[in-house]
Amino acid sequence: MKKMALTMLMGGSLAAQAADNLKFHGTLISPPNCTINNDQTIDVKFGNLLINKIDGTRYAQNVPYEITCDSTVRDETMALTLTLSGSVSDFNPAAVNTSVAGLGIELRQNDQPFTLGSTITVNEQSIPVLKAIPVKKSGASLKEGGFDATATLQVDYQ
């Protein structure tokens, strides 16, 4: 009886053999290397601003930038993203600190605040319009003189 059971098990395993009928293939790619403005600094000049006219809408300047990627090969599951970083003002999460206390530079993408530390998904063929707008802390008394500020705009495929 034991011999017959063993024979049946072995016979069953031989009948289960089949030819390969699945093939897997693809192409391994690296994410494209993308840059903003060919890695050149973007300089936004405001010129002379009247202290009492800084209201968060006046003096808006477009941030001129372009995104260039070194490869046209894409993975549809990957997203092109922009990340904004810098020293955040103490009165507006979308404003970069400036060298003048109480003055910040707010960045907006498509007229919406672009909060520092945040990441947005963008379309390489239709990048968002970025604007820089001087903003003043409520109740602040700004001092006359020059100002400057810096931030970092980074592009990635994720």
Name what the model sees in each region.
Residues 1-8:
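Sec-dependent signal peptide recognition
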Residues 9-17:
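Hydrophobic h-region of N-terminal signal peptides that target proteins for export
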Residues 17-158:
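Mature extracellular/passenger domains of Gram-negative fimbrial/pilin and adhesin proteins
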